[in-house]
Each structure stands twice: as structure tokens, then as C-alpha cells.
């Protein structure tokens, strides 16, 4: 059982993190949209970042609505909000994975024909990749929609004995189909992310070794170190976010209700840090943040 003080502290942290994520999302979309208005073009990475900003904005508002609406009374009145939350979560995973793929294609030094072809076609492919992410996210929530309909049916069958064959069949569908499919929905984009990060890390380490062998300038080596550190941060926080989401879905390791707000504070704290690292990795967003918070020094 979690102490009341810890629960209250977790709720306060969750609300503050939610506000920060909403501000981050609005800033990302506003800055990059202004960039598009000025230059009438955006890079594939910036297109994904705008999509991530919109996704995080919707995800956070949905999360707050669902958490405060159903925590005290876990009735299925908000099941549609829960489905939207899950959809936005899976979409966020796919968009982050696409971002890792873009970084891998753009930065890696592999000379395989597939990488060369992707570098040439990536600008045309990015919209198709976004469409694919939307379709995959929609498909991944189908079992959850069925699951919530099943739970609604179970509420109407309270008059039946607990060991009724109909109730048992409905519960078996939920446990043996819905939950594994949900894990697949989160696992596939994470696997894509993992493969992209591994390939990119291997490429950067090889390139770094070549630069040291040929006695490249210290500034170039420092730049490579900075990229590797950013990559490590990207990997650590997104992996932590994935594992925390998985544990919160399983909910069998601990008393899920008593640890609910602690889990939410941890999850969205990781989201906040991860999104900050993404913003700081983009030159346009980084420049806008510096002008916003350190304008006297930058001028």
C-alpha cells in the first residue's frame, strides 16, 4: 500500500508534467509551422516532430481526462477515452520509431543499396510512413475496442453465476487475445526503434574509429561524441518509457490501484524528458528555445 503523501506528491508531479508536455507540444508545432510558413518546406525529421507534437498534445489531454474521470470510479463510462488514449500511445510509439529510422538513414554511413535508395526517396516516403503509422495504430486498438464491449456485456450479466460458460469465454478472449495483441501493438514499433538505434550506433562507432585512426580534428571527434551521447539519451528514456508502459498494462507485479498515480508520474516524467531531448536535437527548435529563454545572451 502506498502512503497518502506519496500519492498526493505523485498526483502533483503528474499534473506538472502534463502541463510541461502540453507546452512542449504547442511550442514544437508552433515553431515548426512558422518555419514552414517562412520557407514553404520542412525536412522529414521536422514533419515527424510536428506529428509527434500533435500526438503528445492529444495524448496528454486524453490521459488527464481519463485518469481523473475514472480513477475514483473505475466504471466503463470512459472506455472510449481509454481507446483514444491507447491509440495515441501506439501512434506516439510508431512516430518515435519512424524518427529513429529517419536518423538512421540520414546519419549512418552505410553504403548498402537500400540505404542509398532510402536517402534519395525519404522525403517522398515520409507521408506514406505517417499514413502507415496511422493505419497500424488503428489496427492495434481493435482488440481493445472488442475488449471494452466484452466488459460492457459482463456488466449486464451480473445475474449469471461467476463460473458461467459465457462469462468464462469472454474473460478468456480478453486474456488470451486482447492483452497479447496489445503487447504486439507496442512491441513492433519498439523493435523497429531498437533495430534503427543499433544500426545507427554501429555506424557512428565505426566512423568514430576511422576518424581516430586518420587523426581527424578534435572538433570532429567531439561532434561524434555529442551525437553518441544524444543517441544514448534517446535510447535510455524511450526504452524506460516502453518498459514502464508494459508493466502498467500487465498490472500483476503490484497492486495496480494503489500504485496508479506513482506509475503515471513515472511514465509522463519519462515522456517529458524524452520529448525535451527530441526538441534539443533539432536545430530549429533548439534555436527557438534559446531565443525564448536566453534572449539577452543570444542577441
From Swiss-Prot:
GO cellular component labels: endoplasmic reticulum; external side of plasma membrane; membrane; trans-Golgi network
Residues in compartment: Cytoplasmic: 27-44, 104-125, 205-233, 280-299
GO molecular function, one term: G protein-coupled receptor activity
Tissue specificity: Expressed in subsets of taste receptor cells of the tongue and palate epithelium and exclusively in gustducin-positive cells. Expressed in the antrum and fundus (part of the stomach), duodenum and in gastric endocrine cells.
Gene Ontology biological process: detection of chemical stimulus involved in sensory perception of bitter taste
Glycosylation sites: 163
Signal peptide stretch: none
Annotated SUPFAM superfamilies: Family A G protein-coupled receptor-like
Keywords assigned: Cell membrane, G-protein coupled receptor, Glycoprotein, Membrane, Receptor, Sensory transduction, Taste, Transducer, Transmembrane, Transmembrane helix
Extracellular-facing ranges: 1-5, 66-82, 147-183, 255-258
InterPro entries tied to this protein: TAS2R (IPR007960)
Membrane topology term: Multi-pass membrane protein
Membrane-crossing residue ranges in chain numbering: 6-26, 45-65, 83-103, 126-146, 184-204, 234-254, 259-279
Subcellular location: Cell membrane
Chief location of this protein within or outside the cell: membrane
Subunit structure comment from the entry: Interacts with RTP3 and RTP4.
UniProt record similarity statement: Belongs to the G-protein coupled receptor T2R family.
Further details from the record: Several bitter taste receptors are expressed in a single taste receptor cell.
Function of the protein: Gustducin-coupled receptor implicated in the perception of bitter compounds in the oral cavity and the gastrointestinal tract. Signals through PLCB2 and the calcium-regulated cation channel TRPM5.
Listed name of the protein: Taste receptor type 2 member 16
Gene name in the database record: Tas2r16
Amino acid at each position: 500500500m502506498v502512503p497518502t503523501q506519496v500519492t498526493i506528491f505523485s498526483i502533483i508531479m503528474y499534473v506538472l508534467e502534463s502541463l510541461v508536455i502540453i507546452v512542449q507540444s504547442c511550442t514544437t508545432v508552433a515553431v515548426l509551422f512558422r518555419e514552414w510558413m517562412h520557407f514553404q518546406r520542412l525536412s522529414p525529421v521536422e514533419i515527424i516532430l510536428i506529428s509527434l507534437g500533435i500526438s503528445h498534445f492529444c495524448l496528454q489531454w486524453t490521459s488527464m481526462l481519463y485518469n481523473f474521470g475514472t480513477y475514483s470510479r473505475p466504471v466503463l463510462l470512459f472506455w472510449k477515452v481509454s481507446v483514444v488514449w491507447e491509440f495515441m500511445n501506439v501512434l506516439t510509439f510508431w512516430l518515435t520509431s519512424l524518427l529513429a529510422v529517419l536518423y538512421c538513414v540520414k546519419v549512418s554511413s552505410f553504403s548498402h543499396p537500400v540505404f542509398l535508395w532510402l536517402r534519395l526517396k525519404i522525403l517522398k516516403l515520409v507521408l506514406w510512413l505517417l499514413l502507415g503509422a496511422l493505419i497500424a495504430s488503428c489496427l492495434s486498438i481493435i482488440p481493445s475496442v472488442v475488449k471494452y464491449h466484452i466488459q460492457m456485456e459482463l456488466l449486464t450479466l451480473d445475474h449469471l453465476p461467476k463460473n458461467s460458460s459465457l462469462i468464462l469465454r469472454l474473460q478468456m478472449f480478453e486474456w488470451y487475445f486482447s492483452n497479447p495483441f496489445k503487447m504486439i501493438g507496442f512491441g513492433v514499433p519498439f523493435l523497429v526503434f531498437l533495430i534503427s538505434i543499433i544500426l545507427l550506433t554501429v555506424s557512428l562507432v565505426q566512423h568514430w574509429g576511422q576518424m581516430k585512426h586518420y587523426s581527424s580534428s578534435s572538433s570532429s571527434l567531439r561532434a561524434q561524441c555529442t551525437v553518441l551521447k544524444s543517441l544514448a539519451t534517446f535510447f535510455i528514456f524511450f526504452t524506460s518509457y516502453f518498459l514502464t508502459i508494459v508493466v502498467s498494462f500487465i498490472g500483476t507485479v503490484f497492486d495496480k490501484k494503489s500504485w496508479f498515480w506513482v506509475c503515471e508520474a513515472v511514465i509522463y516524467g519519462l515522456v517529458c524528458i524524452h520529448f525535451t531531448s527530441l526538441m534539443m536535437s533539432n536545430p530549429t527548435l533548439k534555436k527557438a528555445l534559446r531565443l525564448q529563454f536566453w534572449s539577452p545572451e543570444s542577441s
